[in-house]
C-alpha cells in the first residue's frame, strides 16, 4: 500500500509541476507524521501541512508548541503550514473555569490566545488555517449543539465569536476593541 501511495503521490506531484512550475505544492497531514514519512511522500511536495488539535481532542495546549518544534526538527528544510486547528465553541455556554471539551466561549478564547502567538513567532510556519471561519452542519456530530461543528469563528447565524475579534486584533492594521 505504501509503495502504491508513493507512486500515486509522485505522479500527482510531477503532473502539477509540469503544468505550473511556479505553483507551490503541499501535502496536508494529520499529526502522525511518521505514517507519511514511511510512505516517502513527505519529500515530494514543496510545503507540508499538519492538522493539529493539541489541547482540544487530547493532550494539553502546551503540546502544540512541542509538536511544532518536533515537526521542525523532522522537516528542517521544509516550510510548514498548520492546515487545521480549532476548538468547538457554543455561544450559549460560558464558564468561570474553562476546560478542554467544555464547549465554552472562554475555553475557545484560551485556545486561540495560546495558538496564535505560537504560530506567529515561528518563521518556519508559513501559514495557518483556523478550522473554520463559520460553524457548519455536520450530521454525525453529537456535541453541545447536535449536528453542528462549532469550531467556526462565526456561528451558523453569523454571530462573531470572541476568537474572531482576537484574529482581528492581531491582524488588522487599525485598533480593535471588543468587550
Residue spans for each PLM region:
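Substrate-binding clefts and catalytic carboxylate motifs of secreted carbohydrate-active enzymes
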Residues: 2-34, 39-179
Amino acid at each position: 500500500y505504501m509503495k502504491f501511495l508513493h507512486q500515486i503521490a509522485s505522479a500527482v506531484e510531477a503532473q502539477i509541476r509540469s503544468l505550473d512550475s511556479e505553483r507551490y505544492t503541499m501535502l496536508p497531514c494529520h499529526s502522525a507524521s511518521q505514517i507519511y514519512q514511511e510512505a516517502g511522500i513527505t519529500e515530494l511536495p514543496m510545503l507540508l501541512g499538519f492538522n493539529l488539535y493539541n489541547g482540544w481532542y487530547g493532550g494539553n495546549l502546551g503540546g502544540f508548541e512541542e509538536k511544532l518544534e518536533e515537526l521542525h526538527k523532522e522537516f528542517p528544510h521544509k516550510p510548514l503550514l498548520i492546515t487545521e486547528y480549532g476548538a468547538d465553541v457554543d455561544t450559549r455556554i460560558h464558564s468561570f473555569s474553562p476546560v478542554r471539551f467544555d464547549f465554552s466561549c472562554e475555553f475557545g478564547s484560551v485556545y486561540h490566545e495560546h495558538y496564535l502567538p505560537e504560530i506567529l513567532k515561528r518563521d518556519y510556519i508559513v501559514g495557518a488555517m483556523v478550522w473554520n471561519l463559520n460553524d457548519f452542519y455536520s450530521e454525525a456530530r453529537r456535541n453541545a449543539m447536535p449536528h453542528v461543528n462549532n469550531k467556526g469563528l462565526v456561528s451558523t447565524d453569523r454571530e462573531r465569536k470572541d476568537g474572531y475579534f482576537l484574529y482581528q486584533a492581531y491582524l488588522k492594521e487599525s485598533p480593535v476593541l471588543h468587550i
